[in-house]
Amino acid sequence: MKILITGGAGYIGSVLVEMLLQRNYEVTVIDNFSFEQNTLANCCFYPNFKIINSDIRKLNELEKIIKSHEYIVPLAALVGAPICKYREADAISINLEHNLNLFKIIDKDQKVIMPTTNSAYGKGESNQVFDENSKLNPISIYAKHKVVVEKNLQNLNNFISLRLATVYGASPRIRLDLLVNNFVHRAFTDGYLILFESNFKRNYIHVRDVCRAFIFMIENFKTNKNNIFNLGLESENLSKKELCQEISKHINFIYREEEFKRDEDQRNYMVSNKKILATGFEPKYNLSFGIKELLKCFTGLNLRHYKNF
């Protein structure tokens, strides 16, 4: 089985690719290595691995590559609200226009497993829990683009959309702008955190569970196709303050709540993941595991290479 992953050298892709290769799938990665990362070096060991250094916006080239692959996992993106605001033109061309063009050249029999985002729910009322049928209210440019992409994705014959919770955990291309990774990194390096709107809640998921979910959907595509799934850990709808309390179980640091400043990221929601749990998929890793993993990671890495923008 041949699988094409765009942006496969990134935070999720650099974990997913090796997991697929270990299962003997044939994997092709297209990536322009814009962060000068060497995150797929270990994967070159596998004879079932192919890597193409190219920009996914070169549509004619992409169309030739796509044809021979049964599954397509479009990970190529500028991920997160800050970088999309900072590089708005690139966010439009990569996150939005590229994906809409991609859908036009995909054959009706090819299968697409698409990462979208549960940040599309935006800001909920107190104790409101969002499921896949809830109204979307995206706040950031990133989330707004994902909503448009997901809507167009549903015009395909064979698709699955995974609305990812806030991802955390170690990866060969680790990101320090993600909330859990960022908080653990600040606790580790600075020893303190200032919290704004500390009651705002998010849902969380470990990067390896994200990859496990992609593999699960590849291996169980027929029974789950043409569906949208929230992907997070059901027990981890936590506020920023509760997240700090979890981190403090593993490292001593000071966190203080302040109200004099408004957080630019106004997302505040809880998410139900019951639909994906009903498929038989179940996350394996929790926050405690991820925090301990990150602390080990930060002990041994020169982190100046892992800024996202």
Give short role names for the model-derived ranges.
Residues M1-L164:
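N-terminal Rossmann-like NAD(P)+-binding domain of SDR-like oxidoreductases, especially those catalyzing
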Residues A9, S134, Y168, N199, ...:
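Structured beta->alpha junctions
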Residues T39-N42, G124-Q128, P172-R175, V207, ...:
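Short aromatic-enriched loop/helix-cap "lid" or pocket-rim segments at secondary-structure transitions
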Residues R57, A120, V167-G169, V210, ...:
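Conserved sequence/active-site signature of Rossmann-fold short-chain dehydrogenase/reductase
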Residues S126, I139, V147, K151-R202, ...:
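NAD(P)-dependent short-chain dehydrogenase/reductase
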Residues D190-G191, L195-F309:
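C-terminal substrate-binding subdomain of Rossmann-fold SDR/epimerase-dehydratase oxidoreductases
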